[in-house]
Amino acid sequence: AWEARPVHLVRDGGEQHRDAYRALNPQQQVPTLLHEGHVLTQSLAILEYLDERFPQVPLLPADAAGRARVRALAQLVACDIHPINNLRVMQYLERDLQVPADARTQWTLHWIAEGFAAMEALLVNSR
């Protein structure tokens, strides 16, 4: 059995910045998985952990090439799309650099479109 505990990233300055959450995850980011006394962070690390810990319900394909393709797609999002469009970056652009809302929107749309175009090409070529 598992229990989800939502973390509101904006309300009251972001629940991820509260002392209790910071004690679990010093990065003050989501997700954080607590399992059997272990505190795990980062989506891909959690994916790998769950896949290895619960092999009867695999999250990754059985073959090495299939697993590599899934990891490549996940890393495309985790490394190329998400980091430059996440909430911390957008708040920094707004608060510290005073980048106007329309420029932030253009920034976001550009990097998301570029990343997903690459992802679509990879998906088409993997058939």
Language-model features and meaning:
Residues 105-124:
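Amphipathic alpha-helical packing segments from all-alpha helical-bundle domains
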Residues 1-106:
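GST-like domain detector, emphasizing the conserved glutathione-binding G-site
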Residues 30, 122-127:
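Cytochrome P450 catalytic-domain "roof"
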